[in-house]
Amino acid sequence: MATIKQIQFKRTKVAGSRPTAAQLAEGELAINLKDRTIFTKDDLNQIIDLGFAKGGEVSGDITQIGNYTQTGNYNLTGDATISGKTTTSTLDVGSVSDLRQTNFRPVLSTTTGSNFIISNSGGLIKPITLTVEGTATSSNTILRHSVDTTVAASGFIDSINVSLNPTDGALVTALNGTVNIGSSLKTPKLSVSGAETALGDYSISIGDNDTGFKWNSDGVFSLVTDSNSIYTYSRDRTYSNRPTNFRYTSDFDATTPALAPPGTWLASVETAIDGNAYGDGMSYLGYKDTAGYSFYFRGGGTFNVASKGGFNVDTAAAFAKTVDVSDILTCSSIIKAKGPGQVDVTSAGNIALGGTIQWVPSYMSGSPNRARDTIATAAWGDADQRINVLETSDPHGWWYYIQRAGSGSSSPTGIEGRVNGSWQASDLISDNTLRVAGAFTCTRRNSAGWGDNAGWYAGATPVVANQGNVQEMDPGVGGFYPGFAQYNYNGTGWNQAFVLGLLGQGVQRWRRGVLALRGDGPVDAGQQIARWYFSQEDGSLESEGPLKAPSVQAGQITSFGVNVTNALGSASIAIGDNDTGLRWGGDGIVQIVANNAIVGGWNSTDIFTEAGKHITSNGNLNQWGGGAIYCRDLNVSSDRRIKKDIKAFENPVDILSTIGGYTYLIEKGFNEDGSQAYEESAGLIAQEVEAVLPRLVKISNDGTKDVKRLNYNGITALNTAAINVHTKEINELKKQLKELKDIVKFLTK
């Protein structure tokens, strides 16, 4: 009795497709509608092709009984064996086109030499002597006589063997002994080696096929080794294309360097004919003398060194003649230029000058054609008043000098210096007298005076600057000790003053510095218009008024308010109103406070909100890096009233079949050594979804690179649509299955 498997058909429309043994049950049928073939499986688990139809394939042997008629071409792969005698008036064996790619080899018998080959070029090849009875006619005749060229006996072999190729006209000749050419030898290539030259036309290879002489162009050829051009020779110059090493070797040894004999040289240049015939007039590279190799550069021109790195001499060098430097001579070590009245730099590094140093200023800014005078520094002196003088001047007069005054000088004996003008300096320090011919004179330590009638004050006396007028400042009253005051004096009385001093009471240990602006009257700590106190005890700054600044930098501030008085307590910042801002909530905790209610905050691991508080965003919420979002429920807006152009998915199953589900490792932060860290996860690949549903993929930057992000809400919709299609198909299959069961039940009664 047939089973349901044996009465059903499997179908395909794919050309060339055949079922496998695993796909068919015994006796089950499969139809290829494209190839018009039928298959089944027998009890030996073999697939059987049940018919040829309009074409087909037979897998196995065919035994033909009767005549075989073939219309069309017969293609055979393998050998064709004919048993018995085959009689035919004509046997035409050939190729389907003029381009024959193989030889036809008839096998006449097993006897050696009885077979022959018809080659693809139309020739007949027979392994033994071919005897032609009668006349042999051929458009191309090749006569060949081979000789053993290893036999050296005179007269035994031909003096020349020639092979002529009628296709390309090549003549291959073996020449034994001496070759004499009466006039000239012309050949596009010449190889003095066992292989054809690889240097190109009109070239000569020597030893191997890529070493020798290579013709480049008209009048230009190169000396080549291993296909590398070493020297190139042209009509007016020779080019060295690789490093050139001049050395001396023995007559028959071209590889081992040796020392050249005395009086010889490695390279020379003829320079005697340009008017400078010093010595023998020649220039030498590596002239061998008793000291070794020397180098001579001669000629009527100039020896120029224009290297950006400069001219370097690694060993001690001496100039036996005068060296004239017309421009700039720069030396990073020692220069010795000797001569009377000139420069002498000794081996100890001392420089002796026999005259004046003149400095020519360079143009920096301003008008470029404005005159710039030479600045001179000179050393001189006399034997009595001014023993040694070092002076700087220009054509308009002296600037300054320093000298050792002698016993005949009106100045005190010793070292002194003078400036012919004003002197500006941040500090003037001297263990002796500092004198200025103008308004300032200092004659002892801790004293100062201003003006023609300067008064002198002890160092403990406060310094008072009164717009050019110097007045003694009152010591202060009420425990206030002023140290500095800047007055605005209008000629009729004291007005506003800027005061810096100390404030203390009795023997109080800690005093406070006072920075104040005061009105008219004596210097009293109680009469400041504005004042700031600096505590000696803890370094704090106190102000009786608000501190206004565009920015504040401080090591520690207990609390402060931004445009408001802080009511949040210590370690807090009030912003806008007195109970709204940031407040310290414990070790590592910062609280966000609004109207004295804690809204949220952050600690070392989290940013949090208090219970009952919410985070509301009118834009996107982005989670970067390897973090995750954890929540109990995720509610996404899906109200029909906020949507338009609602359409069902087309072919959701086909779309879903192009998207794979995967497990993988995904980036999650970094390891302690800085390398990328990963964690296990599972999901989809955004690029696969983008290929079929690009609207579900967005690109955003995670701070280091652009990352594609996936709308899984859309994937849920796609899954739902695909499930609906599958549900419909399942219901249809259930209906068909019921019908098949009814048929089977009927057939098996």
Swiss-Prot record:
- InterPro entries assigned: S74_ICA
Per UniProt, subunit arrangement is: Homotrimer. Interacts with the receptor-recognizing protein Gp38.
Q: What is this protein called?
A: Long tail fiber protein Gp37
Which parts of this chain are annotated as the region Interaction with the receptor-recognizing protein gp38? Answer: 633-636
A single Pfam family, by name? Peptidase_S74
Residues carrying the site annotation Cleavage: 638-639
UniProt keywords (A-Z) are: Coiled coil, Host-virus interaction, Viral attachment to host cell, Viral tail fiber protein, Viral tail protein, Virion, Virus entry into host cell
- Which PROSITE patterns has this protein been placed in? ICA (PS51688)
Q: From which residue to which does any coiled coil extend?
A: 720-749
**The Peptidase S74 domain, residue ranges:** 638-737
Q: Gene Ontology terms, cellular component aspect?
A: virus tail, fiber
Membrane-crossing residue ranges in chain numbering: none
Upper taxonomic classification of the species?
A: Viruses, Duplodnaviria, Heunggongvirae, Uroviricota, Caudoviricetes
Give the organism the record lists: Salmonella phage S16 (Salmonella phage vB_SenM-S16)
Q: Where in the cell is it found?
A: Virion
**Leader sequence segment:** none
* Any one Gene Ontology BP term: virion attachment to host cell
Summarize the PTM comment. Proteolytic cleavage and release of the chaperone in the host cytosol stabilizes the folded protein.
The similarity comment for this entry is:
Belongs to the S16-like long tail fiber protein Gp37 family.
